[in-house]
Amino acid sequence: MRSDMIKKGDHQAPARSLLHATGALKSPTDMNKPFVAICNSYIDIVPGHVHLRELADIAKEAIREAGAIPFEFNTIGVDDGIAMGHIGMRYSLPSREIIADAAETVINAHWFDGVFYIPNCDKITPGMILAAMRTNVPAIFCSGGPMKAGLSAHGKALTLSSMFEAVGAFKKGSISKEEFLDMEQNACPTCGSCAGMFTANSMNCLMEVLGLALPYNGTALAVSDQRREMIRQAAFKLVENIKNDLKPRDIVTREAIDDAFALDMAMGGSTNTVLHTLAIANEAGIDYDLERINAIAKRTPYLSKIAPSSSYSMHDVHEAGGVPAIINELMKKDGTLHPDRITVTGKTLRENNEGKEIKNFDVIHPLDAPYDAQGGLSILFGNIAPKGAVIKVGGVDPSIKTFTGKAICFNSHDEAVEAIDNRTVRAGHVVVIRYEGPKGGPGMPEMLAPTSSIVGRGLGKDVALITDGRFSGATRGIAVGHISPEAASGGPIALIEDGDEITIDLTNRTLNVNQPEDVLARRRESLTPFKAKVKTGYLARYTALVTSANTGGVMQVPENLI
C-alpha cells in the first residue's frame, strides 16, 4: 500500500506513535488497512458547504465499514455570489489553485492510499479535480448537491440569478421594494449549490460523465436522503477501487474530456466549465485543442434548458431523470459520446447510464425535438480573439445569430457597471471590458453584475458584452468571455477603441473588430505595457505565473526554471 511509506518498518515507529495519538486507529490491525483521506470543504459562509461536515461524518463511517481508515482534512472555499462585485472576486479563480495545491500537499505528505473528495461550489470542485489529476491516487467525488429553487410570493420560481437581475429591475423601477425584499428572502431557501445550471452544478454534473462520481451526483438535492446514501455508496466504491488500483488518470482521458464538453453542450452549462475542463486536461497531461469544442458542439444537441436560461431548476432535472437520462439520450446518437470508457464505478459510462429514460420531456427534450441541433456553448475566433473566446449560446435569445455594434470600452469591471447604471451604455453598444483576465484582473473576475444589469434594464437583445474576464454560470445575454490572449498579455482586445464596429457571428463562430490590420498595428505600437495591479501577497505571485484562459488559466512554472 502507498501508506506503508509512513507506517511500516522500525524507522517509522515515531510516525506510528503520532498516528496512534490521532485516535483514528481503534485496534492493532488498523495499521494494516488502507488510509483514506477525506478532502472536505466545509465552511460556514458558503451555503453550498454548510452541510458538508455531516456528509464527511457519513463518509467516515462508511469507509470504516468498508475496511479502511478515514482521515479528514479541509480546504478553503470562496462563495462567488458573496464575493461578487468587489475585491473578493479577484480571489475566486485563484482559490482553485490554492485548493489544488493544499490537497496535493496533504495527500502526498501523508501517503494516503485513496481520497474521498467532498466539493460543491464553483472553484472548489475543479480545484479538487486538479489535485486528483496531479496526485493520481485512487479517488472518488461526491458533491454536496444543489439547493431547492426558491419561490416568490407570486409563485414564481427563483434562483440566485433572479436576485442579480432583480437588482437591475429594481433600479429601473420595474419591481417594487416589497417585491425586491420578498425575492431576497426566498431566492435561496436551503443549503446546497445554487439551484440553476450555474458553474457549481455544471461541474458537479460533468463529474458524472467524466467518470469521477456516481450517477445523479449533479442533481440529487443537498437536503435529500439520496445524497446521504450516495456518500455511503461512494465510500464503499472508493475502498474497492483502492484494492483494484483504479486511478483518476485511468478515467480522465481525452475522450472523457470530449464527453464532458458534450454534456455541457447538451445542458447549456456555464462558460466557466470550459476554463476548468481545459485546466483539468492540462493537469492530466492532455494537450487539448479548443477547436475540438466546436466540433463537439456541432454534433451535440441542446436537450435541457435550465435556469437561468429557463425556469427549470436542478431538482426539476433530477425529477426528469437527471444526468443519466441525458447521457442515455446522447448515447442513442452514434459518435456523440465515448460510452465504453471506464468510470469510478468500475463499469463503463454505458453500463452506468443505459436504459435511464427521460421522465419529463418538457425538462429534458428527446433527440428528435432538441432546443437546438447544436450545443449550448461556442468557441469564437477572430482578430479580437486569435486564441479563442467563449459564449453561452444557450443563454442568447434564439433570434440573434449575429450582432454588430459600436464599441464602448472600459479598462475595469467597476467602470463598466457605473456606465450601465447611469445609462451611458445604450442599445447598439458592444461593451468591452478588458484587463480583467487571469493576469489582468488579477483573477479573471466574473462579469455577472454588468450582464445582469444589462438584462435587468431590458437590453438583453440590444447590447452585447465582450471581455477577457469570465462570467458567472448565472449569466445570460450576448456575453462573450475568456478572450485570449488577454489584454494584460498584449491581446488584441487591448487595441479596440470607442466607436469601433464589432461583429459577433454565432453562425460562423467569429469575433472581429472591423478595422484594417494596419490600423491595429499602429495602435499596438503605442500600447502601454501592462503593470501588475497587485504588488504583494498571493495575487502578486498569481499574476506572475498565470496563463490566459485558452489554457485554463493555470499557473505555470517559468520555462527557464524547467
Swiss-Prot record:
Keyword terms, alphabetized: 2Fe-2S, Amino-acid biosynthesis, Branched-chain amino acid biosynthesis, Iron, Iron-sulfur, Lyase, Magnesium, Metal-binding
Entry binding sites for Mg(2+): D80, D122, K123, E446
EC category name: lyase
Cofactor(s) in the UniProt record: [2Fe-2S] cluster; Mg(2+)
Record-listed [2Fe-2S] cluster binding positions: C121, C194
Any one biological process term the GO annotation gives: isoleucine biosynthetic process
Cofactor: how bound: Binds 1 [2Fe-2S] cluster per subunit. This cluster acts as a Lewis acid cofactor.
Gene Ontology cellular component terms for the protein in this record: cytosol
A single GO molecular function term of this UniProt record: dihydroxy-acid dehydratase activity
Superkingdom field: Bacteria
Quaternary structure note: Homodimer.
Function: Functions in the biosynthesis of branched-chain amino acids. Catalyzes the dehydration of (2R,3R)-2,3-dihydroxy-3-methylpentanoate (2,3-dihydroxy-3-methylvalerate) into 2-oxo-3-methylpentanoate (2-oxo-3-methylvalerate) and of (2R)-2,3-dihydroxy-3-methylbutanoate (2,3-dihydroxyisovalerate) into 2-oxo-3-methylbutanoate (2-oxoisovalerate), the penultimate precursor to L-isoleucine and L-valine, respectively.
PANTHER family found in the cross-reference section: D-XYLONATE DEHYDRATASE, D-XYLONATE DEHYDRATASE YAGF-RELATED
HAMAP family, per database record: IlvD
Name under which the protein is recorded: Dihydroxy-acid dehydratase
Gene name in the database record: ilvD
